[in-house]
Amino acid sequence: MGQGLSQPAQAVEEPSPPAVEAAPSSSPSPAPAPSSLEALAAEAMSFDEDGNESIDVKVQKALDCPCVAELKNGPCGSQFVDAFSCFLKSTEEEKGSDCVKPFIALQDCIKINPEAFSKEILEEEENDEEAEKSNLKVRAPAWSRESKPKL
């Protein structure tokens, strides 16, 4: 979840991955971490899916998916629920771009509670921040680059 504070959820709308069928399980073992928010959303939205339900009912069922239980019940649960719900309900062309505030709140909570998250999530955030910094270029102002007349 390594978005910059001035950036929306970096969720680029791509074709949705195929729906993943939730295999019935007798033990509530934690699911492996999905590679992206889109994958997590697709998995959660396919949980107990019924095409004739309102978006609010679909979001609630997605939040009931075991694939998000650890995030929902952790120390940043309310921030996760707000951000994830907003992302699922988003109708913007760039999915989730209208959810900046909830994702910033989630990001802030993750920074305050790093012990509650896997190293994989925290490293992903650090890598995103490093990549963002490496894309920055410092250029001298135009006035300083202009040639000065010789006297």
From Swiss-Prot:
Compartments reported by the entry: Mitochondrion intermembrane space; Peroxisome matrix
Motif (Cx9C motif 1): 76-86
Disulfide pairings: 65-67, 76-109, 86-99
Motif, Cx9C motif 2: chain positions: 99-109
GO BP terms: protein import into mitochondrial intermembrane space; protein targeting to peroxisome
Superkingdom, natural source: Eukaryota
GO cellular component: mitochondrial intermembrane space; peroxisomal matrix
Keywords: Disulfide bond, Mitochondrion, Oxidoreductase, Peroxisome, Protein transport, Redox-active center, Translocation, Transport
Amino acid composition bias (Low complexity), ranges on this chain: 7-26
Domain CHCH span(s) in chain numbering: 73-117
Region described as Disordered: spans on this chain: 1-35, 123-151
Function of the protein: Required for the import and folding of small cysteine-containing proteins in the mitochondrial intermembrane space.
PANTHER family associated with the record: COILED-COIL-HELIX-COILED-COIL-HELIX DOMAIN CONTAINING 4 (PTHR21622:SF0)
Descriptive protein name: Mitochondrial intermembrane space import and assembly protein 40 homolog
Organism annotation: Oryza sativa subsp. japonica (Rice)
Origin organism lineage: Eukaryota, Viridiplantae, Streptophyta, Embryophyta, Tracheophyta
